[in-house]
């Protein structure tokens, strides 16, 4: 490999890493949603917390550490739906990005 090929390869690698980072930031931002007067981030942590909370009303801290009274079943359903939708979309875009390399 000559120097020009190495430079092209390193630029392509850098562009791919940057594109993956941007893709991650894009979908992490899409995981945020509002419910019951609070802001929540859909993800395994929230889903697991909600799975362990007993049925009925509960008070949880939202993203801004504000106590919010929620119905755990509703919030868990919304979080799981948002998580699955965004993870599926992220996977599709990630696979498209990987084929462009």
Protein language model features and the residues they cover:
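A preference for well-ordered globular domain cores
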Residues: 1-101
